[in-house]
Amino acid sequence: MAAENNVLITMIAHTTDGNEKDTTETIYPGKGYEKDGCYYLFYDEVDPEDAKVTKASLRIRPRHIDIRKKGAVNTQMVFIPGQCTETEYQTPYGKFILTVDTKRAEIRKREKEIDVELDYRLSLGGAQAIRNQMKIKVAEL
């Protein structure tokens, strides 16, 4: 993935909040390229209720992952195994502090595919942390 290529990004998220479990799968067409051992991916998230677009980018580094969003939601989440990171999470309803406690981040690269597995706890505004497990699959088209 040296030059910018069309990619398909599939995200499967498993969320556990107490006894409640939820799974969501979203698929985004996007663009991506590799530079200096990092992968940069760009895609649009469209809110199904009001069709507002949030521009999203995913940077996959050898040891951690960054997700940035700009639009209806503004944030930059950083996933570093064994560390807690804090960021502002700006929504139309206000600004919150988001804490990301990353337990695991695994990255596997193949010729035209990247697989990422994240296991992390998310806490919004000091509320009880919710366990999240996310699988991200990036396939070059």
Label every PLM stretch briefly.
Residues 1-131, 141:
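N-terminal intrinsically disordered, cationic/polar leader segments
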Residues 136-138:
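A short acidic/small-residue loop/turn micro-motif
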